[in-house]
């Protein structure tokens, strides 16, 4: 039987008058604690997660959370943890644009893998705030289209749209990594896998976490 999402206590951050004793303080904390599911608790700390394929529902949920948290506190840095094999182009670009739209910095962290459109989201984080764990992997490649409709007019329209989207993704990598266009275009022609250190050298991330609190910055 599935265990489900665990619940954890959450205390209202608004301070109340200090209690007269330790016992009163403990009683007050127990009364005010609200039990919420684990992800809700993490969201309140501005820790967001992309752990599924990038489809409309997944992207819309994260976009909605980011905008809500931006309204609630426009100065509290948001952190997006990424372990994703990629997904659809349009939802991925929607998430990428939202990262640039919200007022607070958005730290993007790769754990596991950030492949395809997930690597676009990773590189879209605030510069100096994009990082990965030592054993993470990053993969970039050009967008791939599904089968087109047989009708010529639809084929022409969809082909034109696909070329626009492909150019958009290419320009994102060029702008965010500061790599020459010819390097990006050549690397997108195939599945290009990178270790965390290689992704840092490439310009997709800015640093690699080493051990717990230690953070190795690129210089």
UniProtKB/Swiss-Prot annotation:
Pfam families: CLP_protease. Residues 1-22 are annotated as: Disordered. Belongs to the peptidase S14 family. It is an enzyme of class 3 (hydrolase). Component of the chloroplastic Clp protease core complex. This is ATP-dependent Clp protease proteolytic subunit. The gene is clpP-A. Signal peptide: none annotated. SUPFAM superfamilies: ClpP/crotonase. InterPro entries: ClpP, ClpP/crotonase-like_dom_sf, ClpP/TepA, ClpP_His_AS, ClpP_Ser_AS. One of its GO terms (biological process) is protein quality control for misfolded or incompletely synthesized proteins. PROSITE patterns: CLP_PROTEASE_HIS, CLP_PROTEASE_SER. GO terms for molecular function: ATP-dependent peptidase activity; ATPase binding; serine-type endopeptidase activity. It comes from Pelargonium hortorum. Its EC number is 3.4.21.92. Cleaves peptides in various proteins in a process that requires ATP hydrolysis. Has a chymotrypsin-like activity. Plays a major role in the degradation of misfolded proteins. It comes from the Eukaryota.
